[in-house]
A protein has these predicted regions:
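Phosphate-group recognition and catalysis centered on beta-loop-alpha active-site segments
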Residues: 1-216
């Protein structure tokens, strides 16, 4: 997030207090299989440590400072810290399988939407958790992103706002997909969201909530 240390419990609580419709977070597997909440695959940018998450145990990750004294959280802690619906982005099939276990154990189908840049990860979580809402995320894409989303059973496409065109929006609508734009942090980007009549947008700044429907 833009106002709190990103992907920390502090940031998620702030997003909930700001009244966001949905909180987006990113999941990675630690060396010992914990679902760790962090955007990057490495800890370097957002903590005082270095190296890949996948090469560190949960205990090692817990020892890091994620900003303002915050610790790297696991997914279950976020579930307990906020009541806001969540969108959990997974990076691969292995994470899909780990997340599926948590979703079944805690009956999260109605509360958690699952997204990924990886088609096979979306397909896997759809297979493992019947009824789960899924989204295919894309940064560099063409109209084929709509066909890819339909093929893996996604209900939503989350698309880089800088590359979004009316042609893609119309194709997505014709295919029955919802469309979320990211990352929307400026008034110009907000105007584009409204002009294209998107279903929502992802932002780093919860205060922008007063001007539209947003996730953080």
């Amino acid at each position: 997030m833009g106002v709190e240390p990103e992907n920390t419990l502090r940031s998620f609580v702030a997003a909930q207090q700001a009244g966001l419709d949905l909180i987006e977070l990113d999941l990675h597997l630690s060396k010992d299989g914990a679902l760790v909440v962090m955007h990057d695959a490495e800890v370097d940018r957002t903590t005082d440590g270095s190296g890949p998450i996948a090469e560190k145990t949960l205990a090692e990750l817990r020892a890091l400072d994620a900003g303002r004294g915050e610790r790297v959280p696991v997914f279950e802690e976020v579930l307990d810290a906020v009541d806001t619906p969540l969108q959990a982005e997974i990076k691969d099939v292995a994470a899909a399988r780990a997340l599926a276990e948590v979703m079944h154990a805690r009956d999260l189908t109605a509360r958690v939407e699952v997204s990924s840049f990886q088609d096979d990860a979306v397909a896997e979580i759809t297979r493992l958790v019947p009824g789960v809402r899924t989204a295919l995320v894309a940064s560099r894409y063409g109209t084929d992103v709509v066909d890819r989303a339909v093929a893996v059973g996604a209900a939503t496409v989350c698309l880089n706002i800088r590359r979004l065109t009316l042609e893609i929006v119309e194709h997505a609508r014709a295919s029955g997909l919802r469309i979320i734009g990211w990352v929307v942090n400026t008034q110009d980007q907000l105007r584009l969201v409204r002009a294209l009549e998107l279903d929502g947008a992802t932002t780093d700044y919860p205060e922008i909530k007063r001007t539209g429907r947003f996730t953080a």
